[in-house]
Amino acid sequence: MTASKTKKSKSKKKKNVTKKVNKINKPDIEKITVNIGVGEAGERLKKAESVIEDITGQKPIETLSKTTNKDWGLRKRMPIGCKVTLRGKRATEFLKNALETRENKVADYSFDEEGNLSFGIPDHTLFKSQKYNPDIGIFGMDISITMKKPGYRIKHRRIQKRKIPSRHKIKKEETKEFFTKTFNVEVIE
């Protein structure tokens, strides 16, 4: 009897338990794609390539048209734009500068259901490192941020490729939370 009384007499202490965050559920930036669509080949495209290389510090590749459109004077596989893919430290540094041009504000509709973020910058001279040059002109750009979680490798690997289960996919709300905490982004509804 004394043993049962001592067990009952011990009071359970409530611990201040903080919710543990599973590291495999923490989203991160996989890549940032910066695109300038010029719509034509030639000198204007070369100027756009020099602008994007100056801003990102990386050499761009040309994007090609997929179809022929006689009204616009396009042929299939004709160079019509340029893009750069940034990863790692370069990506985060560029993203800080790009968000600074938008005053750290992003619209809610810029986030998609898979947790990615896309927005545009109407004028490349909004970057602090750029000044207006009448010989080059003004170029706008599209910025797409692709998000990932640890374990996303299974959808890209060659052997035993798998789909990401829905419970592990990045949700729109997780991405918003990531950008507000990491980059102090204000999401405008």
Language model features with spans:
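Ribosome-associated RNA-binding proteins
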Residues: 2-189
